[in-house]
């Protein structure tokens, strides 16, 4: 049996399901390209039948990514499989991942069918998917709670139908390692054609055991692990890609297994996903948390000064976290910025040098010295920029009375090419600025969440504002980044307004299409 473990990343499918607001196609593509550089073997990038937006993002990624196999999810229904195949058809090689529930509670309560009927649907779905590609993966949803006799039967029949990968999910994170490892061991012992497929596992983290269960599974013969960057996903999340990659690398002496992951891309990819998904990484998170390589105890610090191996089983450099002694100021040339970006793992196609350097100079003039985390933040923010924005902030002036708490703000907005100026008061400068923008734009959004975080250290650190807002029963996520908190707050709101404007245009297009169809007699 091969010692190579296939890494199947589902950040853009299962991971995105945990987000309060969906990612844009541009943001998904940026993450997909980062995953490609990270070296994932397969990336599951969406559920095409679920929406035109998901279909479009899958198609865009499939047309762009070349070094990782792109996969789309489909229920055991022909319409789902058709949508997946159509969205993926632009790729040279692709995978269709079809699934159906197999546990008793799912079969009886959710599907309201007999197990034999579900088995027939599964076999039919695999055979239908094989019409489009030889690379078909089949998942037994809630396999962790499926009676073992039924699971063995389902796996055997799916392989006979043509599935080349069989995925065994612990969908609700219920099993413990001894149980889950036992399931994989039983499949290898009892399914006669098991050698004709790769066994995959997809473990959720409801009991905090997703990584442990996945490692136990590969010890029993599974050779694909499904995971997400930073472990994001439904409920408590998924198996963490970075933890799996570094466990298999650091403990190769014990496990004897390896992956194709370029570990030096882990830190950069983790930061990118955290930023674009608006999901901060907890400080004590294994591998990528801010404290993962921090030593506070005097005894630990003394040991580290004598030898890093005393308290570090891996180095920061091994995951691409570089110690930087290069000071970047407004006197730094473009070559310095380009060199630093390359050291942090960014390629030329990840950012526009002209845009980044202009933003760098503006920031350097404000705060003097610019650090790695500043450059990363500026690079990430490129994905938030909409070149065809309907709303642009031209000017912001704020006057605040610190004793009374009242403030006045004047904003100048460019709206569809026209300049509009409005002033308003409010309970603090941010409230005043938001009131002025509401007057100027006549765009009514309901802000449901406001988060402020520092990107860096000291009084001149960049401030990032993340807001979530409801508009026409949809949720939107806006981001702003500036050394001034009020400016960052305004940027975030303007970002949301541009997203809502785009949503209105999409709705108008849909309405026109429906009207045209109606006039043509429903054709």
Curated annotation (Swiss-Prot):
Residues noted as binding Mn(2+) in the record, renumbered to the chain: 14, 202, 204, 238
Pathway: Amino-acid biosynthesis; L-leucine biosynthesis; L-leucine from 3-methyl-2-oxobutanoate: step 1/4
Catalysis performed (reactions): 3-methyl-2-oxobutanoate + acetyl-CoA + H2O = (2S)-2-isopropylmalate + CoA + H(+)
Localization in the cell: Cytoplasm
Cofactor(s) listed in the protein's UniProt record: Mn(2+)
A molecular function (GO) term: acetyl-CoA C-acetyltransferase activity
UniProt keywords, alphabetically: Amino-acid biosynthesis, Branched-chain amino acid biosynthesis, Cytoplasm, Leucine biosynthesis, Manganese, Metal-binding, Transferase
Stretches that traverse the bilayer: none
Pfam families: HCS_D2, HMGL-like, LeuA_dimer
InterPro entries attached to this UniProt entry: 2-IPM_HCS-like, 2-isopropylmalate_synth_dimer, AIPM/Hcit_synth_CS, Aldolase_TIM, LeuA/HCS_post-cat, LeuA_allosteric_dom_sf, LeuA_bact_synth, PYR_CT
The EC number(s) this enzyme carries: 2.3.3.13
PROSITE patterns from the UniProt entry: AIPM_HOMOCIT_SYNTH_1 (PS00815), AIPM_HOMOCIT_SYNTH_2 (PS00816), PYR_CT (PS50991)
Any one Gene Ontology cellular component term annotated for this protein: cytosol
Chain positions covered by the region annotation Regulatory domain: 392-523
Residue stretches making up the Pyruvate carboxyltransferase domain: 5-267
Source superkingdom: Bacteria
Signal peptide segment: none
Alphabetical GO biological process terms: L-leucine biosynthetic process
HAMAP family assigned to the protein according to its UniProt record, in alphabetical order: LeuA_type1 (MF_01025)
Subunit structure: Homodimer.
Family in the record: Belongs to the alpha-IPM synthase/homocitrate synthase family. LeuA type 1 subfamily.
Protein purpose: Catalyzes the condensation of the acetyl group of acetyl-CoA with 3-methyl-2-oxobutanoate (2-ketoisovalerate) to form 3-carboxy-3-hydroxy-4-methylpentanoate (2-isopropylmalate).
Name used for this protein in its record: 2-isopropylmalate synthase
Native species: Shewanella sediminis (strain HAW-EB3)
Source taxonomy: Bacteria, Pseudomonadati, Pseudomonadota, Gammaproteobacteria, Alteromonadales
Primary gene name: leuA
């Amino acid at each position: 049996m091969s010692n190579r473990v296939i890494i199947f990343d589902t950040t853009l499918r299962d991971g995105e399901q945990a987000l309060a607001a969906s990612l844009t196609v541009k943001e998904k593509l940026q993450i997909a390209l980062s995953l490609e550089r990270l070296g994932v073997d397969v990336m599951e990038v969406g559920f095409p039948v679920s929406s035109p937006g998901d279909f479009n993002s899958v198609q865009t990624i499939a047309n762009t990514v070349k070094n990782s196999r792109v996969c789309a999810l489909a229920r055991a229904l022909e319409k789902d499989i058709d949508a997946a195949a159509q969205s993926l058809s632009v790729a040279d090689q692709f995978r269709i991942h079809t699934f159906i529930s197999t546990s008793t509670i799912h079969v009886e309560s959710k599907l309201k069918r007999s197990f034999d009927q579900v088995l027939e649907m599964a076999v039919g779905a695999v055979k239908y998917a094989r019409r489009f590609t030889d690379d078909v993966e089949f998942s037994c949803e809630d396999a962790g709670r499926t009676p073992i006799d039924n699971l063995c039967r389902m796996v055997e029949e799916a392989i006979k139908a043509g599935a080349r990968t069989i995925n065994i999910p612990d969908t609700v994170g219920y099993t413990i390692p001894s149980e889950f490892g036992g399931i994989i061991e039983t499949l290898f012992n009892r399914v006669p054609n098991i050698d004709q497929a790769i066994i995959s596992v997809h473990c959720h983290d409801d009991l905090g055991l997703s990584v442990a269960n996945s490692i136990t599974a590969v010890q029993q013969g599974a050779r694909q692990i499904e995971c997400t960057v930073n472990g994001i996903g439904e409920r408590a999340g998924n198996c963490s890609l970075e933890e799996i990659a570094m466990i298999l690398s650091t403990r190769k002496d014990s496990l004897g297994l390896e992956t194709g992951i370029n570990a030096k891309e882990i830190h950069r990819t983790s930061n990118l996903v955290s930023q674009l998904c608006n999901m901060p990484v907890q400080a004590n998170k294994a591998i990528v948390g801010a404290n993962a390589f921090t030593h506070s105890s005097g005894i630990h610090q003394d040991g580290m000064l004598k030898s890093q191996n005393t308290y570090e089983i891996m180095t920061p450099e091994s995951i691409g976290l570089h110690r930087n002694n290069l000071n970047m100021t407004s006197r730094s040339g473009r070559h310095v910025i380009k060199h630093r970006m390359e050291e942090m793992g960014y390629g030329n196609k990840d950012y526009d040098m002209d845009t980044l350097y202009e933003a760098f100079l503006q920031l350097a003039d404000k705060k003097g010295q610019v650090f790695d985390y500043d450059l990363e933040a500026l690079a990430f923010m490129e994905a938030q920029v909409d070149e065809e924005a309907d709303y642009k902030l031209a000017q912001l002036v704020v006057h605040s009375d610190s004793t009374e708490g009242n403030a006045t703000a004047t904003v100048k907005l460019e709206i569809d090419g026209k300049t509009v100026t409005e002033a308003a008061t409010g309970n603090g400068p941010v409230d005043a600025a938001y009131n002025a923008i509401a007057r100027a734009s006549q765009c009514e959004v309901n802000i449901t969440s406001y988060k402020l975080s520092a990107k860096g250290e000291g009084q001149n650190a960049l401030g990032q504002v993340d807001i979530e807002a409801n508009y026409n029963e949809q949720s939107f996520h806006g981001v702003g980044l500036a050394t001034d908190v009020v400016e960052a707050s305004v940027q975030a709101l303007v970002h949301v307004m541009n997203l809502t404007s785009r949503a209105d245009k999409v709705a108008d297009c849909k309405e026109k299409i429906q009207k045209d169809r109606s006039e043509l007699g429903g054709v």
